A protein has these predicted regions:
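Membrane-interacting helical modules
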Residues: 1-124
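Alpha-helix capping and helix-coil boundary motifs
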Residues: 10-17, 24, 42, 46-49, ...
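Short, charged low-complexity linear motifs
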Residues: 26-29, 226-231, 618
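Assembly/interface hotspot detector across virion components, adhesins/toxins, and nucleic-acid enzymes
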Residues: 41, 127-129, 492-493
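Charged, amphipathic alpha-helical linkers/stalks
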Residues: 301-450, 457
């Protein structure tokens, strides 16, 4: 911990004290930013809220502290120096509050709240069903430039390449070629950038007749203007072709990554190919194989690849210009085919109204009542939004996939057209939830192919469960930007025994004011504040607030409202807080290191608070409390 040791002893240069104080402020800022789990992981279920913007606090505040230090020359006596330090500290505290408020208002913190890693796991069961949107995608022609074969890498979320393969303006996580291989490209619009899949040679290539190519070799064939089976300098547009080596593997072309064919040693490209189905590893496959001839006379591999992808991880190629008011709105990072929440709201009056109503809601009950509408309005900004999902029973067979049935399985198989009205109605009832899951995942679920009633039931159950987890995560990630934000705005800094610490005094006072008006609201707000903010359990502020929560719980028991309040707060939050209620039987209940409230109910109970400033309530029976 940083110590303030501004010396005022005779013979000591006061400037040393000033340097120490500023050094302490610097370290104190780092203390706040690095040691406070609250500000690093607020409302982020996976604890992955990036702290890059928060670290700007030190850069933001220290110049202001030095500017404030112009009054240092007046600190010529211990009393004056003490006053100066006090003023400086107050400046630090106010600076912190202003900085944090600015971050919230500008959306710098909320914009970093990321749903993707958590939802990637949540949505996986939904994505595994056989749908009409299931197809092999993204087949660019790729050149083996170093002679060791075409090497690829797996899609890797936001850490890997994001590329707009189909030209819809959305870059998605894609399998990719290694940096020692090259994608054959052509800058069709002349802007010096490989904007999307239309600039590659693959299924997104637009042919001269306006149709799309079936694969990369079909697109390449149009560049063989003299029809001799190779594309070389004798062909009209040979000099327009480029090879893109994505050296930094981000899926974004830079000027220094685009090479002429001559620069990478290519003499000619052979139009002939053979169909294949080679597994290249990393979720990528080789679908057509051909070759090219180098300037050195060597023949090397050129192949049409099928990249794996994850449409959940996405970025729109073009951002939306926001007004100051729109930038101040609550925000979540866009995923699938959805923009960031506040960008989507800027383009959709319906979503903007839903977000405003949700933000103004003052209780959990009110927000939960508005949550489905908010998620639905956000989902409707999906450019491919559709609620036309249906079940289909026919068996399917593709070039690479088939179905084999045992006699027992054949009996269980649905006959064509046998989807009952009952299941059609059940699916219809879930249509908006399915559309939302499609929008968030980037999937397409126009038709769900099933072979049995069990598969239909399984799909319907998966939709309900996955949608529930999605909305829960959206709710938790918006908590501290909406209903609980006023409490965050009260966080300050304090100087305790020469150390900078977060100060929750005003936070506790605000909870007290709310409690005086509505004990249930204060109970739920404080419970969620503690359950989802992830304040370090070793922080004194956490101990004080958890003790306050335990007192609210005891008050609720005494007033007969505890069960009502606990139900409003929710089982998950209660468990996170370590608050437990026994049954009518003989229970053994343990708390955790927090300030727990544990009530035994009926029966002869054994209750241990474990650690923290606990309130243990035995209830009826012959109880043991420790």
């Amino acid at each position: 911990m940083a110590q303030i040791y501004a010396s005022t002893k005779p013979g000591v240069n006061p400037a040393e004290g000033w340097a120490a104080a500023i050094g302490s402020l610097s370290t104190g800022a780092n203390l706040v930013l690095n040691n406070s789990e609250l500000l690093k992981t607020i409302s982020d279920k996976n604890g992955q809220l990036y702290d890059k913007k928060l670290k700007d606090f030190e850069k933001w505040f220290l110049p202001k502290a030095f500017a404030f230090g112009e009054g240092f020359e007046k600190a010529i006596s211990p009393a004056a120096w003490e006053k100066f330090l006090k003023d400086l500290f107050e400046k630090a505290d106010q600076g912190w509050k202003n900085f944090y408020k600015e971050q919230l208002e500008e959306g710098l913190l909320p914009a970093l709240l990321d749903l993707t890693d958590f939802l990637d796991k949540v949505l996986e069961p939904f994505k595994t069903y056989n749908k009409d949107g299931k197809y092999h995608i993204y087949d660019p022609l790729t050149l083996d430039l170093d002679g060791d074969g075409i090497e690829t890498v797996s899609h890797n979320g936001y850490k890997g390449a994001l590329f707009d393969h189909d030209g819809d303006g959305i870059r998605t996580a894609s399998g990719w070629v290694a940096s020692d291989a090259g994608l054959l490209v052509v800058d069709r619009n002349g802007d010096g950038i490989i904007n999307d899949g239309k600039a590659l040679f693959g299924e997104s290539s637009v042919l001269k007749d306006g149709t799309k190519a079936v694969h990369g070799y079909a697109a390449l064939a149009e560049y063989d203007s003299n029809g001799d089976g190779v594309v070389d300098a004798k062909d009209a547009d040979f000099d327009k072709l480029r090879v893109w080596r994505d050296l930094n593997q981000d899926g974004v072309s830079q000027k220094e990554e685009l090479f002429t064919l001559e620069e990478v040693g290519v003499q000619s490209l052979n139009v002939a190919y053979q169909d294949t189905n080679q597994n290249l590893g990393n979720g990528n496959r080789l679908s057509q194989e051909g070759s090219y001839t180098g300037k050195d006379g060597n023949v090397r591999k050129m192949g049409d690849l099928l990249f794996g992808n994850n449409t959940l991880y996405s970025r729109y190629s073009q951002s939306v210009n926001l007004t100051d008011e729109q930038r101040a709105a609550a925000n979540l990072q866009g995923i699938g085919r959805l923009r960031d929440l506040r960008e989507a709201a800027a383009l959709s009056p319906a979503l903007a109204a839903a977000l405003q109503a949700y933000t103004k809601a003052e209780t959990k009950v009110q927000q939960k009542a508005l949550l489905d509408d908010l998620v639905d309005k956000w989902a409707q900004t999906d450019p491919n939004y559709s609620v036309g999902t249906r079940f289909s029973a026919p068996m399917l067979r593709t070039a690479n996939e088939g179905v084999a049935l045992t006699p027992g399985q054949e009996k269980a198989m649905l006959m064509v057209g046998s989807v009952s009205d009952e299941y059609k109605e059940k699916l219809h009832e879930l249509r908006t939830k399915i559309a939302a899951l499609d929008a968030f995942s980037g999937e397409k679920s126009g038709v769900i192919y099933v072979q049995s009633k069990e598969q239909m039931e399984s799909f319907l159950k998966t939709v309900r469960e996955t949608y529930g987890k999605l909305t829960d995560n959206v709710y938790e990630n918006l908590l501290f930007q909406t209903r609980l934000q006023p409490y965050l705005n009260k966080i300050g800094l304090k100087l305790e025994n020469g150390e900078f610490k977060l100060d929750f005094t005003d936070v506790a006072a605000l909870f007290g004011e709310v409690y005086a008006r509505s004990p249930e609201k204060a109970f739920v707000d404080l419970g969620e504040f503690l359950a989802y903010s992830k304040i370090s359990s070793g922080d004194n502020a956490f101990t004080e607030l958890s003790s306050l929560m335990a007192q609210y719980s005891l008050d609720a028991v005494n007033s007969g409202t505890f069960e009502q309040y606990a139900e409003a707060l929710g089982k998950e939050a209660m468990e996170k807080l370590g608050h437990k209620t026994g049954t009518e039987k003989d229970d053994t209940l343990y708390g955790n290191e927090l300030a727990n409230f544990i009530t035994g109910g009926a029966g002869d109970d054994a209750i241990s608070g474990y650690g923290g400033n606990d309130i243990l309530h035995g209830g009826s029976g012959n109880d043991t409390l420790q």
